[in-house]
Amino acid sequence: MTPETHVDMINASEKAPKERAYVTFLAGNGDYVKGVVGLAKGLRKVKSAYPLVVAMLPDVPEEHREILRSQGCIVREIEPVHPPDSQDAYARAYYIINYSKLRIWNFEEYNKMIYLDADIQVFGNIDDLFDMQDGYLHGVLSCFCEKIWSYTPLYSIGYCQYCPEKVVWPAEMESAPPSPYFNAGMFVFEPNPLTYESLLQTLQVTPPTPFAEQDFLNMFFGKVFKPVSPVYNLILSVLWRHPGKVDLESVKVVHYCPPGSKPWRYTGEEPNMDREDVKMLIKKWWDIYNDESLDFKPKSPADLEATVLESTIIASVTEAPLSYSPAAPSAA
């Protein structure tokens, strides 16, 4: 049986005060490093008070690590986490590598962290999320309207959390209406060694599902999940799926996750990528990325040395690798 998750297991409120930080994930030698650089500069632009930790797999080349250190990021190497079964079960094969994100629950030198995918950009200060109630995982509800959800009964009946009132849950459905389900590109959490161990143990007895770690985290934290406003994680497809639900002036976080929307790969040729609002958000990302005034500028050589030293010390704390299956390919 799957171990039951309890609120007190993830509650860090009784721990001594520690640091806060943002954290993202990076794997491989591809171009996602550009996303992390853009995110680091975006956090500086909105004057965030907290650093960005980059949890990265061993296959990230030293050249990319140096780029991130030069942008003030704290580099922390982690070992991959592999689920017990093959990647055939996933909506996209590369999703399997995202289970490695579970390692961030072992970053116990931090009291609270905000996870952000590397294809996210912040356009407003979101430090207030650190003040969310302890003992819960906070995130933004997912939209179920894109074709990638077509394997689910939710998609077949047109149900979506953004507009649940539009579809009456059919009585003939064998299951009850779904529990709230968050997008794992952004969430607020509390690192905790007990939670970390429970996550890894639970993974060993949990069958894989199409959305990999996102499904897993929703299952694991289902009883302690609390939704936050969509302004903290605008999934780009909501622009055309639920236009009446979007006020771009108030959006603080944009998630460039639909196919063709990664700013550093953008061509405008994929479906919906020629929309004016999409083009505007792509331009805003590039404006931040290209703004040299947002590059990390240590106040003194000692500040730069401290950033490098912190990355070095953290990287020296190695994780025990898990050997559930052969190594998964790096994220594209």
From Swiss-Prot:
Keyword Iron: no
Cofactor(s), names only, from the UniProt record: a divalent metal cation
Function: Galactinol synthase involved in the biosynthesis of raffinose family oligosaccharides (RFOs) that function as osmoprotectants. May promote plant stress tolerance.
Keywords, alphabetical: Carbohydrate metabolism, Cytoplasm, Galactose metabolism, Glycosyltransferase, Manganese, Metal-binding, Transferase
Protein name: Galactinol synthase 7
GO BP field: galactose metabolic process
Cellular compartments annotated: Cytoplasm
The encoding gene: GOLS7
Enzyme Commission numbers on file: 2.4.1.123
Enzymatic class: transferase
Keyword Glycosyltransferase: yes
Organism: Arabidopsis thaliana (Mouse-ear cress)
Family membership noted in the UniProt record: Belongs to the glycosyltransferase 8 family. Galactosyltransferase subfamily.
Residues reported in the UniProt entry to bind Mn(2+): 117, 119, 255
MF-aspect GO terms: inositol 3-alpha-galactosyltransferase activity; metal ion binding
Catalytic site: 101
Record lineage: Eukaryota, Viridiplantae, Streptophyta, Embryophyta, Tracheophyta
